[in-house]
Amino acid sequence: MSDDLRPIVPSVEEVAQLVADLVVSEWPRTEGERAVWFERHGIVTEGAELIRDEHGSESWISRDPGAPWPAVGWEVCKAEFVGFNWFLWRGLPEDVMPALAEELRARFVEIAGEPMDEKREEGDDYRFTAYWQRGGRSIDMYLHGGPVLEGRFHDQPVVQLSVDHVQRSRKAAEAAAGARVAEGRARP
């Protein structure tokens, strides 16, 4: 285990409690409702910028370096709020990340039951994905990165966490897939 004794910000409990609160709350529909909802739950979006705008979907990210949480991203499709995501704990020592991810996974099991879908890679290349649904919302968690293995890509460990409105997320994915098919047909 690492000797780095910096506090974990946000803590596993803070992340789990916020996600639990958001999943059961009334999901915002419009940009105005989303802004109020984020503010009510302490999600900082100052300095937000549009990073993708195509096929009726927009992706936004807040890059506020003064926020206690990492940058938050969110998606809007056809003017409806779909969901949000974080990349948590980037920069922490590699030997700390798996335990944090497993602790967060355990909290999500308490919140939403066992994952509907889960994939794991054990051993030196340890990582996992887990997916839950509860009340029309999804929680999608990935442990990325890890130790360098010969001939393999290495990235700094990070936990990717997305929380979406299931039906709106499905519509956004279908709209994007349909647009890609149409673009492919339009090419000579």
Task: Give, region by region, the residue ranges found by the protein language model.
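Active-site beta-strand termini and strand-to-loop segments that position acidic
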Residues: 131-137
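Short helix/turn-capping signatures at newly exposed starts of structured segments
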Residues: 1-126, 139, 146-188
